[in-house]
């Protein structure tokens, strides 16, 4: 049986959309803007790093990062992100969302700058220091996932909560675009100031000494939006749900939200104390009671995020083939180092503009209309369909006259990842767990996703290699080929459909309804259905 809600929480649930909602979206969203910039800008400069630090005299093609170095440079931030999601998620429940929120930004600011200052006399030393700082950059980025999602969900009203939380996540799309646009500007400026011949004409002269500044400037620029947001985050009040339900301070919660909502709210400290005495609310994380109430939900959020990120991040494998096929990136030897940065940045920006960003904002528009479950199910379904449609007739798509069709199918997979599970896996864990575990459980779910990202980004990089050892990329062992890898990804997406049935629908419900925190007794089960009943 449900009890009467605390007035301060009810006021938040029924509040009309106000300016403070948009302020919270901007403050939290700028963190995700920075996260995406920092995580994805490395892909813009890895080719340049290969030219600068791994040039081979007399080689027909420009230098490239060795496979182990490329894996480390691209993947170390994911490792840091995973660790940060677990640590800051736990800390957000222990110390409060606000106290920890500023820490993540400071780590991101310092490590963005430090990444651009990576030093050493030998290429290995430069790459080692770059990897060190990018690990800790990822650590700060990881903290932003559970904290931003939790803060936004706890501030939002129940009618438009999904749109607000997914809008924060959608800022990633703008971060990816900003990285590409900034790289275009920087590379254009350096090309105009320091023109140089193509690699085929002058191998050594094609990489100017000033190119070493280009990648450093691009990496360090990530500190700017993070630094600009720090003051605003420090002025945000603690969320009422943490203050009331975890810190047990109804007076402070009412005072904070009275200022935010600009309404008079009664503290109700006595009612809160009565709620706190109930033994049913004393169960711990991973206790028998927790597992009976939320175990399947946690399995649902972790498994779907894990499976989604395997598919989502492995799609980057095919970008180089697609960009080359449609002429966005000419052969490396036909360009100088700075021109290559420009071409890669332009391609990434176009992909973000045409498929990534629209997908995010379709989710924002429809998540509170058709629900999280429907969007996630639809996204996984279409990702499965398009992956098999690419895989089964793969030889058909390799013919030059059919490559545009391949690009369209590929873009649609990206679109339905973002208008689908890439957004919903972020939203749902912030809505369905009790306040005292909310940040931790979101961190666990997100960390599971980053584990999937590592499998997708690196496992499939090896898996997709040609079975013929003479046709593999330099330094890689034979794999199962692109076609078979696409079939595996189709199966992964299909598993995502099945595990989605473990994830409850939270559209239109309060956080306390979803978590069972408004139930009167120990035997009351959370009645949120996994599959929505129409």
From Swiss-Prot:
The UniProt record lists the keyword Ubl conjugation: yes
Transmembrane segments: 25-45, 71-91, 100-120, 132-152, 162-182, 212-232, 294-314, 350-370, 373-393, 404-424, 443-463, 485-505
Gene Ontology molecular functions: phosphate transmembrane transporter activity; symporter activity
Induction: In roots by phosphate starvation. Repressed by the Pi analog phosphite (Phi).
Entry keyword set: Cell membrane, Membrane, Phosphate transport, Phosphoprotein, Symport, Transmembrane, Transmembrane helix, Transport, Ubl conjugation
Stretches in topological domain Extracellular: 46-70, 121-131, 183-211, 315-349, 394-403, 464-484
GO biological process: phosphate ion transport
UniProt keyword Ubl conjugation, yes or no: yes
Function: High-affinity transporter for external inorganic phosphate. Acts as a H(+):phosphate symporter in both low- and high-Pi conditions. Confers sensitivity to arsenate.
Protein name: Inorganic phosphate transporter 1-4
Gene source species: Arabidopsis thaliana
Lineage of producing organism: Eukaryota, Viridiplantae, Streptophyta, Embryophyta, Tracheophyta
Gene name of the record: PHT1-4
